[in-house]
Amino acid sequence: MESTIILIIILTASVLGRANSVALATCFLLILKLLNADKFIFPYLQENGLFLGLVILIASILIPIADGKVSYISIRNVFTSWLGIFALLVSLFTTYLSGLGMNYLTIQGHSEIMPALILGAVIAAAFLGGVPVGPMITSGLIALGLKLFNKIGS
């Protein structure tokens, strides 16, 4: 019951904050709980959901290449420009942060911070025009900050 109340609070905040992806995901989980399918589907989602979500996200990003809107020449030009090189470096850093974040949340077991990450994403979507895809990077920044803090404090 407590988890349902928390999900309803997240749903309310995400609807008010216009974070539609968070609202949809929360509704999906609430429906699974209502149908008592959570016992079967939650373990699968917890194990494979991130991977499946990334596959869909990356596929949607690759569509301009797949449908021919991006050519080999334009790709070559991007990688020889300062913007392309900068994008590559930022991508390396954010992908590294995402890995740190996933490790921090899952392997190190700090999933209790997820409500704060979601709320931050919802607030950013509502008031800053953000898109709530950053909890993994945010948790990566937290993990990196803690690593640096521990090194400095040692």
Curated annotation (Swiss-Prot):
Sorted alphabetically, the Gene Ontology cellular component annotations on this record are: plasma membrane
- Entry-linked InterPro entries: UPF0756_TM
A Pfam family that the UniProt record links to this protein: DUF441
Identify the keywords attached in UniProt to this record, alphabetized: Cell membrane, Membrane, Transmembrane, Transmembrane helix
Q: Which residue ranges traverse the bilayer?
A: 5-25, 48-68, 82-102, 113-133
What is the membrane topology here? Multi-pass membrane protein
Keyword set includes Cell membrane? yes
Annotated compartments: Cell membrane
Indicate whether Nucleotide-binding appears among the record's keywords.
no
What family does the entry list?
Belongs to the UPF0756 family.
Protein name (database record): UPF0756 membrane protein CKR_1028
* Source species: Clostridium kluyveri (strain NBRC 12016)
